[in-house]
C-alpha cells in the first residue's frame, strides 16, 4: 500500500506534524511540488495552514488530481480563528470528484504553539493517519 504525506510549502506549522505522520507510515513528508503525479497512490494525506489568503498552489494541485491515480484523499490543517479553508478544500475535492475520506483532522494553533507544536497535536495526528491507513487497507 502506497501512502503519501504532503504539505504546502507555505505551511510552517504543518511541516512538523506531517513529518510525524510520515514517520508512522514509514515514508517521508514532502511538499506538494515534490509529489510524483504519475505513480498511483492508495492514500494521499494533504496538510495546509488556514490563512485569510487563498492558496492558488494548493487549489491547482487538488484540481490536477484524479481518481485513477489517487484512490483516497485525507486532509489535515492548522487554523487560528476558524477553519474556513478546510471547508473550502473539502468542497473543492468534492467538486473535483475525488475520493475524500470521511474524517479530516484540524487543530487550533494557540499563541504557545506558534514556536513549537504541542505534543498532543502530534500524537493526535499520528492516530488520525493510523486510522486512515487502517480504513484504506481494510475497507477500500
Outline where the language-model segments fall:
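FMN-binding flavodoxin-like domain, especially the glycine-rich phosphate-binding loop
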Residues: 22-28, 40-140
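Short, charged N-terminal beta->alpha structural module
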Residues: 1-26
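Short amphipathic alpha-helix with an adjacent loop that forms part of the alpha/beta core around
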Residues: 34-40
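Conserved acidic residues
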Residues: 31
Amino acid at each position: 500500500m502506497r501512502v503519501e504525506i504532503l504539505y504546502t510549502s507555505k505551511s510552517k506549522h504543518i511541516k512538523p506534524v506531517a513529518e510525524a505522520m510520515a514517520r508512522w507510515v514509514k515514508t517521508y513528508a514532502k511538499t506538494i511540488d515534490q509529489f510524483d503525479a504519475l505513480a498511483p497512490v492508495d492514500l494521499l494525506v494533504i496538510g495546509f495552514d488556514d490563512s485569510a489568503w487563498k492558496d492558488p498552489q494548493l487549489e491547482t494541485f487538488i484540481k490536477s488530481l484524479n481518481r485513477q491515480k489517487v484512490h483516497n484523499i485525507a486532509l489535515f490543517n492548522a487554523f487560528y480563528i476558524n477553519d474556513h479553508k478546510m471547508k473550502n478544500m473539502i468542497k473543492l475535492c468534492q467538486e473535483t470528484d475525488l475520493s475524500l475520506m470521511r474524517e479530516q483532522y484540524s487543530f487550533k494553533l494557540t499563541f504557545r504553539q506558534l514556536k513549537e507544536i504541542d505534543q498532543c497535536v502530534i500524537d493526535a495526528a499520528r492516530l488520525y493517519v493510523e486510522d486512515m491507513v487502517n480504513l484504506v487497507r481494510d475497507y477500500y
